[in-house]
Amino acid sequence: MFRPGTFMEASMRQGSTHGRRGFLAATGAAATACALGQEAEAAATGASPIDALTVRPPAGFQPMKAPGKVTKVSKGTDATALMQPNELWPRPEVARQMLERAMMEFTGASNGVEAMKKFIHPDDVVAIKVNGIGGQSGFTMAVNFELILPVVEAVLAVGVPPEKVTVYEQYPNFLSGTRVNIRGNKLPDGVRAKFHGNTLATMPYVSVYQGIRTKYCRFLTEATAVINMSLIKDHNICGYTGLLKNITHGSIINPHDHHTTHANPQIALLYNHPIVRSRERLHITDGFKLIYDEGPLDKNPRRRILHGGVYVSTDAVAMDTVGGKVIDDVRRDKGMKSLA
């Protein structure tokens, strides 16, 4: 159990069956079958679409992987110490310090830049997927600019040119919900902030689930490395929304076609595709606040509470497992049923 006021680390191993861990385990065979089916089709035609869309790290670089491991840093839930006066956004210096501490603890590096070097190479093209759907009205519940900025700055400090760094979202109002380039919250010169609008995709169609064709957006496919930044929220369709769904339904051209049956197994299959898995490098969860009910939109402020955490992982399933348990613990304390 995480204790407020201290810096803590939690590790989860892949055998757990809670939440998204069990979800992906249950659908892993289907994901493999999907990939094998595409490979068989490619062999029959002499083409290799998966190989063409799969990327590899720069020569000689091996990004750090720690399956099942999640590191959380917390400084408690004192709003005065953590948050700006509106209690919606973290204090910039607090967000920066907590992120660096989480990165250092996760990697064992001596500072935040050295930690980022474990995941990003100067020759990478970097896409940073943020989440702002809950912040489109009043900037209330989105990945905070105060956390996005130090991530971008660390990537630049590694040596990646700014023109090779893109912060992206699905829609313009989702992107503005993060306050990127809003009200003076500027990204470093040359770094792009873009939205794809479910239309900007350059790859061929792929069929991932039940023959439904889709494309991943160009900001993801043109990158060699993806940093995934999301939140801790419940979701009225799929139960929990965090890192996995941020990439899947936030990076394809037809997310509306992949929500049936509570988006199960679509989330797992879309995420487990080599297009995604070959690019994932780092997952950061903005846990300064969370929504435990009536999500994913921030429609009821009474369902949004201070949580005071920053999480780092290379395993989106492990982190979503942790996030789901965090929400279930809150719901149990409030006499509500589990998300499961």
Predicted feature residues:
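N-terminal and secondary-structure boundary signal
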Residues: F2-A340
